[in-house]
A protein has these predicted regions:
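Short, Lys/Arg-rich flexible segments
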Residues: 1-156
Length: 156
């Protein structure tokens, strides 16, 4: 097969998958599977709205590119993979001053680490709908290619 059919398939896949993954942000879920809700305390501080969108920086940071025979999605935000995959991780709490509510005395809290659990809120990855979209793209491009071959054959 000519190289440009691969390029066309990969280019179409890149556009379609980017659209599908950004739709996951709008739908607040991964192809119909709703994300785990945030804690009530977080909702009160931030107000109502989308679970993963406060400033929109993570959604805007998602980039897609074609590398070889694959479409690759990247982000320059360090927390993107953490949200997409979920998991436990350690956070270092810096030393700081705290004032006691009872006595009014100020004391220093030493630096320490705390375990955090991030629930998975996947928005990029393999899914049945991704496979269906890719299948549709390949089928459409192969039909166009075979039609061009038939037209060229009939002209000669």
């Amino acid at each position: 097969m000519p190289r440009n059919i691969y390029d066309n398939i990969l280019s179409d896949a890149r556009v379609k998958l980017t659209e599908l993954f950004k739709d996951n942000f709008r739908q607040q879920g991964f192809f119909g599977e709703k994300w785990v809700a945030t804690k009530a305390s977080k909702t009160n501080k931030r107000g109502r709205g989308s679970i993963l969108i406060v400033t929109g920086a993570m959604r805007r940071s998602i980039r897609s590119m074609i590398r070889g025979m694959a479409v690759v999605f990247t982000s320059d935000r360090p927390y993107t993979a953490l949200h997409n995959d979920g998991g436990n991780f350690a956070v270092t709490v810096r030393s700081h001053s705290r004032t006691s509510k009872k006595t009014g005395n100020t004391y220093t809290v030493r630096s320490h680490s705390r375990q955090m659990n991030m629930p998975q809120r996947q928005f990029i990855g393999d899914h049945e709908k991704v496979q269906q979209a890719l299948g549709d793209i390949v089928f459409k491009r192969l039909q166009e290619f075979s039609q061009r071959l038939a037209d060229d054959f009939n002209r000669h």
